[in-house]
């Protein structure tokens, strides 16, 4: 494709017809990938800035790569802000300020559609039916709170299916984490009273709750019901301890405390969550920013991107003013369909102290981040020199596979970046092995073999022996990966590392040639006796070489390889475990679909079936003692 004009000349040509109105513009590279999305109060004036002479290096690189430019007119600046935020979220342009790793925060959910409501963790922006408490800064925070609540209030956490299948109390009852409503150990009225207490606690009404419990304890004592009174006493003590440990603020009720700091062109935004006056944890973010970005700009973009995924509290308290605060407030209100929010920068008092605390945490988080970043950059430079790369790698993809003689085969990809592993980019490839030449040890019947490949376990793996064809598995994984990279060229890796040797090198070259791609790659194989520290590296056009096992770059490459290896084994075992759970019951003579369903319904889960005694198995409808013994023996046979 031949382009007539690009870069600044393209922008000059677009200026002729550019309107003096608010809107959003988009810059594209030669592959029509979005490089940058920007908003403007006046599109003509904003685009004019890109043909001036005092631009920073990153902006100059962006303009040089711009081959297409489009703009959209909006009715207001708020609309422009909204559209810009939506497009940045959708396209993740490389030259924009980006907020990465922004998962939605978890909540505690109390279901209200059951006679005995369930307490569970919930993640997602759309809050379905039920009562929600939070958000919490991390799964650790919410899991810890749930554990404490179960110790104190003993509400059920099981699913409805498990609840309905119980004929005896489960382990949670035995360890005093549940009152076992499933088998009538507590009535509806008493359980509802506990639900009300949980609501009061999570909504911050701890003083009223403790007063009510104290009155109830005295009442029970006066009635000589000392055991029940002692239980209430222990609950009051536990509530006091949890409240003290969680940290309670009398300064804010529902608020996000947000502080931004900068050092050497890197930014950290620390967010503290307060709900119902209780601290719900904190989390640091490290948005990527351009060279000439300011704190005001980074914080503005952070707020717009952050509150596209997170729930908005009544108050947002920040440590730095933003330029376009009123429009940002209006945009956040429209994004979340709410009527009122308040963004403030306190100068004194309790709120200012909370902001100062968040800023102190942000500085510490940024220093730790920069240490990790600097160390990683040193290693990345050594990798660049070692493998003759044109630039310091920003994204390294590492590939491995796992199987047992071709069964339950999976390939995996793990990703390492500027500051370590990027786990949200990890991928698992379920390898479809029936296309290979298979030899079943149990039967030469092709139909039976294909049936075993796709037996209703949801795992598309061959039940026969495919001779462990690593090359074909790698070919499939890379074919699927490169197909995806054609659609996502902005995710092209700087380097691919494949766990394998000379033969794998040829497969990678074959697939690369087929896709006409030129991504640098290297194969890393075990050395003598497959001992760590003697790894061999295979690169096209070079002799096989090894590295001193004490070199930092060698240790780093081993860490990359081991991460991929462990991720592959983990996912292989998951697949194998799912298949074994089903097939073990399927393989027992006399246990068909009806009896299998009866077993699972009676015990509630496959694990519970395995834990059952012969006597307990024989209590299931349709299972006699002889069959119970057979089931028990098969389930307790070693793999």
Curated annotation (Swiss-Prot):
GO molecular function terms listed in the Swiss-Prot or TrEMBL record: DNA binding; excinuclease ABC activity
Organism superkingdom: Bacteria
Quaternary structure and interacting proteins, as annotated: Interacts with UvrB in an incision complex.
Keyword hit for Nucleotide-binding: no
UVR domain residues: 207-242
Lineage, broadest ranks: Bacteria, Pseudomonadati, Pseudomonadota, Alphaproteobacteria, Rickettsiales
Family annotation (Pfam families): GIY-YIG, HHH_5, UVR, UvrC_RNaseH, UvrC_RNaseH_dom
Keywords: Cytoplasm, DNA damage, DNA excision, DNA repair, Excision nuclease, SOS response
Protein name per the record: UvrABC system protein C
Role of this protein: The UvrABC repair system catalyzes the recognition and processing of DNA lesions. UvrC both incises the 5' and 3' sides of the lesion. The N-terminal half is responsible for the 3' incision and the C-terminal half is responsible for the 5' incision.
UniProt domain GIY-YIG: residue ranges: 20-97
HAMAP family from the UniProt entry: UvrC (MF_00203)
Subcellular location: Cytoplasm
Main localization (coarse): cytoplasm
């Amino acid at each position: 494709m031949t382009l007539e004009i690009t870069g600044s000349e393209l922008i000059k040509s677009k200026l002729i017809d550019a309107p003096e109105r608010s809107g959003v513009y988009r810059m594209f590279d030669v592959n029509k990938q979005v490089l940058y999305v920007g908003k403007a109060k006046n599109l003509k004036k904003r685009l004019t800035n890109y043909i001036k002479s005092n631009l920073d290096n990153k902006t100059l690189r962006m303009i040089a790569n711009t081959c297409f430019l489009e703009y959209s007119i909006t009715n207001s600046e708020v609309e422009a802000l909204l559209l810009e935020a939506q497009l940045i979220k959708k396209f993740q342009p490389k030259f924009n300020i980006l907020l990465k790793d922004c998962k939605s925060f978890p909540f505690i959910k109390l279901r209200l559609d059951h006679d005995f409501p369930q307490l569970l963790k919930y993640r997602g922006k759309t809050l379905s039916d039920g009562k929600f408490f939070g958000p919490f800064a991390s799964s650790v925070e919410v899991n810890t709170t749930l554990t404490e609540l179960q110790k104190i209030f003993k509400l059920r956490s099981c699913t409805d299916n498990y609840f309905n299948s119980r004929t005896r109390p489960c382990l949670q009852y035995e360890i005093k984490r549940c009152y076992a409503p499933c088998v009538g150990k507590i009535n509806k009225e008493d359980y509802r009273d506990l639900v009300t207490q949980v609501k009061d606690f999570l909504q911050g009404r701890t003083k009223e709750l403790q007063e009510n419990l104290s009155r109830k304890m005295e009442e029970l004592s006066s009635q000589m019901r000392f055991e029940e009174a002692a239980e209430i006493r222990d609950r009051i003590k536990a509530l006091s301890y949890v409240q003290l440990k969680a940290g309670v603020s009398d300064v804010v009720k529902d608020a996000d405390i947000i502080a931004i700091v900068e050092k050497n062109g890197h930014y950290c935004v620390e967010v503290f969550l307060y709900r119902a006056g209780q601290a719900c944890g904190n989390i640091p973010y490290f948005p990527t920013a351009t060279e000439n970005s300011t704190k005001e700009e980074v914080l503005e973009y952070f707020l717009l991107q952050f509150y596209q995924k997170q729930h908005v509290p009544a108050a947002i308290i920040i440590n730095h003013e933003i330029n376009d605060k009123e429009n940002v407030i209006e945009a956040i209100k429209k994004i979340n369909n709410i009527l009122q929010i308040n963004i403030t920068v306190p100068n004194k008092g309790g709120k200012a102290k909370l902001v100062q605390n968040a800023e102190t945490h942000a500085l510490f988080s940024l220093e730790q981040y920069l240490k990790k970043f600097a160390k990683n950059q040193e290693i990345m430079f050594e990798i660049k020199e070692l493998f003759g790369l044109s630039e310091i790698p920003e994204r390294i993809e590492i590939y491995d596979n796992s199987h047992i003689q071709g069964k339950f085969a999976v390939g995996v990809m793990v990703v390492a970046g500027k500051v370590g592993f990027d786990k949200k980019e990890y991928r698992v490839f379920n390898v479809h092995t029936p296309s290979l030449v298979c030899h079943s040890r149990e039967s030469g019947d092709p139909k039976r073999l294909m049936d075993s490949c796709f037996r209703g376990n949801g795992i598309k793996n061959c039940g026969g022996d495919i001779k462990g064809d690593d090359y074909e598995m790698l070919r499939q994984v890379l074919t699927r990966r490169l197909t995806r990279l054609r659609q996502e060229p902005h995710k092209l890796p700087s380097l691919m590392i494949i766990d394998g040797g000379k033969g794998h090198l040829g497969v990678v070259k074959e697939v690369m040639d087929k896709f006409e791609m030129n991504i640098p790659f290297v194969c890393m194989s075990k050395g003598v006796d497959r001992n760590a520290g003697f790894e061999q590296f295979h690169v096209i056009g070079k002799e096989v070489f090894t590295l001193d096992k004490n070199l930092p770059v060698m240790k780093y490459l081993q860490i990359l390889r081991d991460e991929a290896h462990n991720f592959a084994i983990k996912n292989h075992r998951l697949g194998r475990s799912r298949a074994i759970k089903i097939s073990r019951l399927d393989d027992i003579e006399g246990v068909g679909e009806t009896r299998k369903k009866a077993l699972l319904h009676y015990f509630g889960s496959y694990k519970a079936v395995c834990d059952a005694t012969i006597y307990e198995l024989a209590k299931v409808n349709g299972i006699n003692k002889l069959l119970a013994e057979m089931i028990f023996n098969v389930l307790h046979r070693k793999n």
